[in-house]
Amino acid sequence: MKLNKPLVITAGEPAGIGPKLCSSLVNTNLLNEIVVIGDASLLDDKLKVIDTPFPAPVKAGCPDPRNAKTLLEGLEIAVKGCLSNKFSGMVTAPIAKNVIADAGISFTGHTEFLANLTNVDFPVMLLVANNLRVALASTHIPLRDVPDFITKERLIKILCVLQEDLKRKFQIKSPEILVCGLNPHAGESGHIGKEDEEIIAPVVKELAKSGMKVRGPISADTAFTAASGHKDAILA
């Protein structure tokens, strides 16, 4: 799809693969203009670049916490450009979260960082590949904390946000959503964990009764197979 304004790409961790990925775009026949935010000395000079030089020397494979602040400033430039309609959208190259944390900066991931910059109280991460759309019920938290994180209130909010965005951003008039179970085989009727039976199933039932086309909990090992039938999105 041809966009009216350029896409902005943040080059990510300077010691990682991001700058090389961005530089490879000069040999690609892109439909839209792109602008890259990063250290110009690490990027192909044919790219249109907003230069954000890093204070510490960059060595491939050896991220330096001294560069973390500049990296995040590049993300802020991209977000402000999108909010001011300078850019049509943004793409983020990989970063090293641990290096940012080592710099003493509170950072759990792009999702939460962008939500904070855009004053979004309840961000929902959606992964999209062609017609496969997967929303996540949790993002950057330890696995041991996930069961306590999956509450009825949270699931209802996520599913309502997902339904609305499928309508508004993907022009799907009446989206159908599958909800994955939390435990193996969606809990086997409560024999492998109680969350699917006590939390997920009641939420699905309540929203389905209100008119939402939602089904679950579905065992995660079968939700992505053709046998599950075509659905517009999966909540996992």
Feature names for model-found ranges:
Residues 44, 127-157:
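Ligand-binding beta-strand-loop-alpha-helix segment within the catalytic cores
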Residues 126-127, 169:
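Short secondary-structure boundary/capping segments
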Residues 1-110, 149, 153-236:
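Contiguous, glycine/small-aliphatic-enriched amphipathic segments in soluble metabolic enzymes
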Residues 111-121:
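A glycine-rich helix N-cap at a beta->alpha junction
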Residues 49, 123-125, 134, 234:
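Conserved beta-strand scaffold positions in the cores of enzyme catalytic domains, especially
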